[in-house]
Amino acid sequence: MTIRNQRFSLLKQPIYSTLNQHLIDYPTPSNLSYWWGFGCLAGICLVIQIVTGVFLAMHYTPHVDLAFNSVEHIMRDVEGGWLLRYMHANGASMFLIVVHLHIFRGLYHASYSSPREFVWCLGVVIFLLMIVTAFIGYVPPWGQMSFWGATVITSLASAIPVVGDTIVTWLWGGFSVDNATLNRFFSLHHLLPLILAGASLLHLAALHQYGSNNPLGVHSEMDKIASYPYFYVKDLVGRVASAIFFSIWIFFAPNVLGHPDNYIPANPMPTPPHIVPEWYFLPIHAILRSIPDKAGGVAAIAPVFISLLALPFFKEMYVRSSSFRPIHQGIFWLLLADCLLLGWIGCQPVEAPFVTIGQISSFFFFLFFAITPIPGRVGRGIPKYYTE
């Protein structure tokens, strides 16, 4: 190729050369397993959420008198509207399932350790943004569970000393959840996915600064191959399997994670007998309820994310992967079981023995992060990880 042809080649232009560098020729450890495909899958889920959300917004009316009917209009009158709604509603759960798997893979292989501290912290911020976005997106259908879920969750801010009630009034736009609340939540639900997309690009850029971790936790600049075509083809297996799972979900069981009360228009007079949050809030909900005091329960939510953010700043471990750390591996599986137990407790009534089980499970959840540095110092016989 002549110099003139190289100058006008698309791959030589700044934007295309950047894409080529980060998506095609990006050097990747050759021993990555299928667990490393969930990051890309999460990006695909985010794109699906943004695209379906834009089309749904074309037919949705953010007004308390029209919101519920506009959702039914999408389901019944808009061609393909039922598919758009089910893809968007269940796509949020699919997105969070993928991200949870992505996080637990990072915990198992200690992907938060040096030199990828910033990558992990950005990921935790993205996870927090996702939860906020999912909560805000649960309000626009304006069913009974949407209304009362918004009322209960936003009321938690009243536990903040001095300014709590002012914050709640500001969130509501009045003295109760009403039209102003619906409008501002709908507007924020448009904005936050764009912030999520930007944060995801920063997350990707930070990852590519030092390269991906690998199942062995061993740093090497030699044993690497280009992402394309090798890992594109390998990840295709996971993407096809996920697409099949998601298709079965939205075509055969689209309401399996929904709540029947949300098919009743919002009514501030009757309170549902049991207000249950979406499944991705259940572990946090269980931790919140495990402390009898309202202010203490709300205060316990912050340490969940602070604990995740603090992981990279623990003392450096001699070996990274849990495959070589049986003590940490056992603790990890106990944490996974504990999170599943917290999820189950979160949807149970506030009564014995569920409260006691929730308190024990919450204690172990925080204990895991407190003792994480200890097993990391065990195993001096295994060669230390080097970043140079």
From Swiss-Prot:
Heme b b566 binds at residues 102, 203. The chain crosses the membrane at residues 38-58, 82-104, 119-139, 185-205, 231-251, 295-315, 327-347, 354-373. InterPro entries: Cyt_b/b6_C, Cyt_b/b6_C_sf, Cyt_b/b6_N, Cytb/b6-like_sf, Cytochrome_b, Cytochrome_b_C_euk/bac, Cytochrome_b_N_euk/bac, Di-haem_cyt_TM. Its cofactor is heme b. It comes from the Eukaryota. A ubiquinone binds at residue 208. CDD domains: cytochrome_b_C, Cytochrome_b_N. GO terms for cellular component: membrane; mitochondrial inner membrane; respiratory chain complex III. Heme b b562 binds at residues 88, 189. One of its GO terms (biological process) is mitochondrial electron transport, ubiquinol to cytochrome c. One of its GO terms (molecular function) is metal ion binding. Binds 2 heme b groups non-covalently. Belongs to the cytochrome b family. Component of the ubiquinol-cytochrome c reductase complex (complex III or cytochrome b-c1 complex) that is part of the mitochondrial respiratory chain. The b-c1 complex mediates electron transfer from ubiquinol to cytochrome c. Contributes to the generation of a proton gradient across the mitochondrial membrane that is then used for ATP synthesis. Heme 1 (or BL or b562) is low-potential and absorbs at about 562 nm, and heme 2 (or BH or b566) is high-potential and absorbs at about 566 nm. The main subunits of complex b-c1 are: cytochrome b, cytochrome c1 and the Rieske protein. This is Cytochrome b. The gene is MT-CYB.
